[in-house]
Amino acid sequence: MTLAEKILSQKAGRKVEPGEFLLLEPDIALANDITAPLAIKKFKEYGGKKVKYPDRVVLVPDHFTPNKDIKSAMQVKMMREFAREQGIEKFFEIGRMGIEHVLLPEEGIVKSGDLVVGADSHTCTYGALGAFATGVGSTDIAGFYLIGKVWFRVPESIKVTLRGKFKDLVTAKDLVLKLISILGVDGANYKAIEFSGPGVKEISMDGRFTISNMAIEAGGKTGLFPVDEITIAYERERGIEVEEMYPDEDAKYVREVEMDLSELEPQVAYPFLPSNAKDVSEAEKERIKIDQAVIGSCTNGRIEDLRLAAQILKGRTVSPDVRCIIIPGSQKVYKQALKEGLIDIFIDAGCAVSTPTCGPCLGGHMGVLAEGEVAISTTNRNFVGRMGHPNSKVFLASPAVAAASAIKGYIADPRKL
């Protein structure tokens, strides 16, 4: 069996097959300040009085928080009141929250082998832990509140075999952008993307979260890593004991892709699709002027990402024509960055440092683009109008490329600084 089949079989209590429909009880049901209010309204419309499993419900206000306007304040107020009313303890108030997909693994809320649903498409991030995690609609979450179950179709799987080691300043973000360019934005529709091979051990947990996070950008249902010694060490730091989990040798896949980490260059995904990836050495030749650089998000807002950005920015200055916004993914990441002196490096370089928020990624706040403006961002989507005005543009890249570009004022190769 594949990893996806193993986890779903364990939850179903029997062996399952791709294409089969299941009604299962997830371990965690997540929603945020955009998706939770609709789930709450629907729960009440369905006649709900008491949430079936309040201990499995997680509510994280992160998209428009700290509240950017009255409407967003009302959204979070609804979440807050629902949590109190239902005895939901895992409501993360502003000041204690983080970007949801950074926060939940960090807090040990999601663990290896879990079945997780979230009313957010990047819930697939937790596949890095060897959890079957996938995005669902707010009405699915409402259904979970009511009966404690959600329907699933067992996905087919794509196997991605990794070999070699990353070269200097090449990262997990570059790997996943390259993979999406190979698969296409719909190449993994309703399939699990499973990572294997000796190269897996070269990727840290922070890097694995980045890769699994963007599985959805190829249409993937989830992006799964095996549970190995790296996963076990991460979980043990949080007081969680898990066992190794690998796919069976005779597991069946609908497609197989091989990638050599040592052959990768830093990547840049051009507008308006995450699959439009090019080598940064080629992009640099075009001298694409930028107005803004964003380093953060559920894709690249972890401590390793900030360390990499600081490595590039230390002793240098952001171009006077560029706004560089740094967003730690959680309060713990922020505190660690403070402890390591990274925040000083960012401020000395001329960056703005924000409290944890999804803000600019979805064009919500904290970095909305004006007409004609261009951004390079460590986020995960660059669709038309994604970060602001419909006539703005977003290029996706790693923290190293984003930081180098902020310094140069145009999309630049960090290896040449």
From Swiss-Prot:
GO MF annotations in UniProt: 3-isopropylmalate dehydratase activity; 4 iron, 4 sulfur cluster binding; metal ion binding
GO biological process: L-leucine biosynthetic process
Residue positions binding [4Fe-4S] cluster: C298, C358, C361
Pathway in which this enzyme or protein is active: Amino-acid biosynthesis; L-leucine biosynthesis; L-leucine from 3-methyl-2-oxobutanoate: step 2/4
Similarity comment: family membership: Belongs to the aconitase/IPM isomerase family. LeuC type 2 subfamily.
Name assigned to this protein: 3-isopropylmalate dehydratase large subunit 2
Gene designation per UniProt: leuC2
Highest taxon in the source lineage: Bacteria
Claim: Iron-sulfur is one of the keywords in the record: yes
Catalytically driven reaction(s): (2R,3S)-3-isopropylmalate = (2S)-2-isopropylmalate
